[in-house]
């Protein structure tokens, strides 16, 4: 959801406006997000009604996925690391559509950009400073779903030479094996009425191929003594579209085992993250533990024969073992939406682009995690939880409204096996929780405050 979307028929921006008031209206007004639903024409491939105009330039928010930080700092960092601003192509895409569809658009845009850059006068000058004065090649920097687009564009796209013309790919929080959070989105409200934004997202997500492409493909369905992958029938049972699930399964089967050229994965760690689920009578119960298989595909079990559980954490949305197809990762204690904005992540991007030896950022605070509600009610206390430390010494936690009208401390105290702070915000709006551990990059997450209205389906 990191691209601003524009409705060409109405002339309205339908995702990504720069104020919290728009977010509140989008998630709570009766027709707030109606324009984002895929139409029958769009499902048949007749596109053009909605266009992606640019990358997000202002914070956004969604139930379950929570805060989505803008890409201004990432684009600025990349631009400072290249020979000329014309060497950089920000690629916005309609995230409602399938990975396969957007991958085709990405492959075409990347090829055109490379050919245009190779004709640019600054390219000829830059070659004089490169080993063997070689021609410029592509480097992809991709956050979240963008990494799946890049994988599909380079390994199964229409341009068979694109991978050979690529020097490297840097992914940040990409769910290569999907995310349990996507299943939770589709299942919202199956058991009971839910907050209005959550129900609205479920109805919206049901129409979206892109959301179905983010469903977990690893063994995550807990059936007691057996753990297996979700099938299209399971996805229909939990609230998804079976046809879209079949298409998504075909995509992931095609991409499984494919390697990205020069890949480095930045992976969020230590944040509480959904990793598995049960599905009973159409209701999903998600858990913060996963399961592992031996090299022969057999499930790891304990001495009683029960499946062995592992809490590997993640970035709050994508669990650690889904965020990279290999074990070669750069771990960062950051939330998913902030992975493309934190100072440590931006330093890793700079290092990757400039081909310096990369040892990864300092890991002093790598085990600290933050947990906040995605939606709160103004005037009602709620809790920030901090995991991985047992003392508030050296920690500063604060809450501020993104628009700047409110700011205040969140005083941490000991609460069982973690720290906590009780917070109350005065008015509807988008708020940023910041936990400063003394490391270069603080932990941040966005919370939407809105009236407590229920969606009963």
Model-identified regions with their sequence ranges:
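Secretory/organelle targeting and membrane-embedding segments
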Residues: 147, 156-363
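N-terminal non-catalytic accessory region
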Residues: 1-141, 145-190, 194-201, 316-320, ...
